[in-house]
Amino acid sequence: MPDPVIAAAKPSLVKLEGGRAYFWCACGKSARQPFCDGSHKGTGIEPLRFTAPRTEETLLCACKRTKSPPFCDGSHNALQGGYRTDAESGAETPIIDRDGDHHPTSWLDGGCFVRTLDPARALRRGALALTPAITAKDGAGLLSVFEARLMKGASDSFAFPDADIVAFVTRGAPAFHVNGERCETKPETGVLILNGESLRLENPHEDEAVVFLTVCPARTEPLWNPKGEIRQDAPRRRAFGVDPALREPMADRFYQVLNGPENGSREITQFIGEIPQSRAEPHQHLYEEAIVILSGEGFMRTQTKRAAVAPGDVIFLPRKQVHALECASPEGMRLMGAFYPAGSPALNY
């Protein structure tokens, strides 16, 4: 059987009607991509009939290399020229400086922004300083991000009602007490706290601990010392650290999922990303995303603007916003990303 033709280097964004049957072009020759128009006749490659499980927007494979037909699985990222571009290529766009009387922020196209957090804006409660980094006030509709800084000691118990949390430790080794269950961590550990569970942070060390909390759905502030019914599940693994054996390639980039549907995070996917000195092709996602830069410097680019990024900066990407993250550091860049709805970080169009 001949190999299918690559119809396009990126997947097709389509809106499917729940319960309706479709025929996905598997040969790559259809003029009605990503659907069949009969051009497969004589190729030996038959179209795939499938029924949409629900009415939704989704990405159907156009490179015909997916391992999950008809849906995109990110295989197009491995095509030559499918993702990476030279960091020095292309016309330069204006650099937007930080401004504002809130956290210093660079506002880019479509509501995308890069933010450097101002510690003076933190909400202080005992040993804990909690800073809202991304909330609905910034245009986020699906998730919020908070930076938690903890001196030696323990915080009060808190929760975000009717929301899941994925936490990420960037500094120190704080202990997480989730419904009273203790969970030890270290830098670059992701921790899952589900809807209905309460959280208390403890820092037994002299040095400050720093944790980023991604909350979904979006919330503006926590509920302190929550009362009433607390979710009680059997003890389970909550903390997931970096494991080189679990890295997934995405062209010249890599990622590792820390929390996602596979381990019970039904709403949010949290991942570690590694970027060499390069610039991504402009692309979009069907999810709303928050990014924290861990190391390396570069630029976040949108259609007509760009902003410098450095360790500690927070980036907000609205759903469907065209963007490209560039690493300018020879040693590369590391980042933590979290997005809703949960899925694969490799899916882009």
Where would I find each of the regions flagged by the language model?
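Ligand-binding loop in jelly-roll beta-barrel domains
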Residues: G139-G141, N195-P222, A310-D313, R319-P345
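N-terminal pre-ligand scaffold of iron-sulfur
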Residues: M1-P34, S39-L60, T85
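Short Fe-S-cluster ligation motifs
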Residues: A52-G74, I95-P104
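A short, N-terminal "cap"/entry segment at the start of jelly-roll beta-barrel domains
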Residues: A91-L142, T220-E267, N348
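Short, conserved beta-strand element in jelly-roll/cupin
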Residues: A26, E147-M151, A159-F176, P217, ...
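Conserved short histidine dyad/triad with adjacent acidic residue
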Residues: A127-I134, S144-P161, Y255-N259, T269-H285, ...
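Short beta-strand His + acidic residue motifs that chelate non-heme Fe in jelly-roll/DSBH
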Residues: D156-F158, F176-H177, T185, I193, ...
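Short acidic-glycine-tyrosine-enriched beta hairpin
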Residues: V166, G180-G196, T304-R319
